[in-house]
Swiss-Prot record:
It comes from the Bacteria. Heterooctamer of four alpha and four beta subunits. Is synthesized initially as an inactive proenzyme, which is activated by self-cleavage at a specific serine bond to produce a beta-subunit with a hydroxyl group at its C-terminus and an alpha-subunit with a pyruvoyl group at its N-terminus. Substrate binds at T57, G73, A74, A75. It is found in: Cytoplasm. It catalyses: L-aspartate + H(+) = beta-alanine + CO2. It comes from Thermotoga petrophila (strain ATCC BAA-488 / DSM 13995 / JCM 10881 / RKU-1). One of its GO terms (biological process) is alanine biosynthetic process. This is Aspartate 1-decarboxylase. Belongs to the PanD family. Pathway: Cofactor biosynthesis; (R)-pantothenate biosynthesis; beta-alanine from L-aspartate: step 1/1.
Length: 114
């Protein structure tokens, strides 16, 4: 039987920009995506730590090294610049999966990898 497991998590990312009238979703620095094991276009669950909003969207690859986490389109209504979010990707598996997690500081720099 297949179960759904957490496979990747970017913990405590800080929203750097938002734009409501934009085609898109959540843009994540390419380097952070790679470190967390998240692919462009992958569906993610985003949890806003500041306001408890939860939403499902897809990832847009951002500029490598920019440390930007940007909300676009309708998702931009669910967060403000400076809010901290948790970005999670899941997978189907018949066996437990060890999630890859990166923890970020207030500058969206990696301070811990698990």
């Amino acid at each position: 039987m297949l179960n759904i497991y957490l496979k990747s998590k970017i913990h405590m990312a800080k929203i750097t920009r938002k734009e409501v009238y934009y085609e898109g979703s959540i843009e994540v620095d390419e380097e952070l995506m790679e470190k967390a094991g998240i692919s462009e276009g992958e569906v993610v669950l985003v949890v806003n730590v500041n306001n408890a909003a939860r939403f499902v969207t897809y990832v847009i690859k951002g500029k490598r090294g920019s440390r930007e986490i940007n909300l676009y389109g309708a998702a931009a209504r669910l967060g403000e610049e400076g809010d901290r979010v948790i970005i999670m990707a899941f997978t189907f598996s018949d066996k437990p999966v060890k999630a890859k997690t990166i923890v970020l500081n207030e500058k969206n720099e990696i301070i811990q990898e698990k």
